[in-house]
Amino acid sequence: MKGLVIKNTGSWYQVKTDNGQLVECKIKGNFRLKGIRSTNPVAVGDRVQIILNQEGTAFISEIEDRKNYIIRRSSNLSKQSHILAANLDQCMLVVTVNYPETSTTFIDRFLASAEAYRVPVKILFNKVDAYDEDELHYLDSLITLYTQIGYPCFKISALTGEGVDTIREELKGRVTLFSGHSGVGKSTLINALVPGLEVKTAEISAYHNKGMHTTTFSEMFPVPGDGYIIDTPGIKGFGTFDMEEEEIGHYFPEIFKTSANCKYGNCTHRQEPGCAVRKAVEEHYISESRYTSYLSMLEDKEEGKYRAAY
């Protein structure tokens, strides 16, 4: 029997079979995927084969080939990854310039990870109703930056409804992963997009000005127009999983394009003579914040660490 994994609760997986039945499944035996070192071999969005036993228990016996997936640092094993979701049509990264602030380093690491696994990303700048003039000016500068690179950007307010109808249209016929720091209003936005869903939300910690986690495990919800939303736990950071040092620049589109003009084919864009990327940064053709994010990922790779980006 075939089905779609719609929820992961750690040891159990909820599968929606092709005939619409919801089945609670476990993994059969020491199930592992070849070539993927992760804490969860099965992810929300996976198409799977399940076996129903006479006792009423069910097991996932096989996973169909994935078209893509996206991973983050495992929360408890720093050198292992955790697959957030599989078979995605797009990611929507929810960010805020304050309450709490999403750093450009975090944004860039997420984008690089999505580029590595061939998942298109749209950036949703939430809480636009809450910003002062300086914050709105900064927000506009970020939108200009990321739009020029090629990432669609949207101004929204989950609280007032600004931009929500536009995002709802973007969900039709697509499997969409929603991600972002805790506290950026991701769950509030999902509730606004799909009235009646009632995804749990939380307050911002007044002491740290950071969000408190409300989503514990990834879960998939149907949305009008034959689409699906995948809600994920709030994420603290992304590491350089499965990336070789020389590949990291490939996942920054503007750096990759400019690197064709570097003097050396293996240029890492740090100290090498004739580096077209460093020249482009100096001449403001490439954003200094993006270049700094790139260097931080190189540093992680050199030190063998998987550092959270705040």
UniProtKB/Swiss-Prot annotation:
Keywords linked to the UniProt accession: Cytoplasm, GTP-binding, Hydrolase, Metal-binding, Nucleotide-binding, Ribosome biogenesis, RNA-binding, rRNA-binding, Zinc
Cofactor: how bound: Binds 1 zinc ion per subunit.
Cofactors required: Zn(2+)
NCBIfam families recorded: ribosome small subunit-dependent GTPase A (TIGR00157)
Quaternary structure and interacting proteins, as annotated: Monomer. Associates with 30S ribosomal subunit, binds 16S rRNA.
Role, per record: One of several proteins that assist in the late maturation steps of the functional core of the 30S ribosomal subunit. Helps release RbfA from mature subunits. May play a role in the assembly of ribosomal proteins into the subunit. Circularly permuted GTPase that catalyzes slow GTP hydrolysis, GTPase activity is stimulated by the 30S ribosomal subunit.
Alphabetical list of HAMAP family matching this protein: GTPase_RsgA
Stated family: Belongs to the TRAFAC class YlqF/YawG GTPase family. RsgA subfamily.
Protein name: Small ribosomal subunit biogenesis GTPase RsgA
Organism: Bacteroides fragilis (strain YCH46)
Taxonomic lineage: Bacteria, Pseudomonadati, Bacteroidota, Bacteroidia, Bacteroidales
Gene coding for it: rsgA
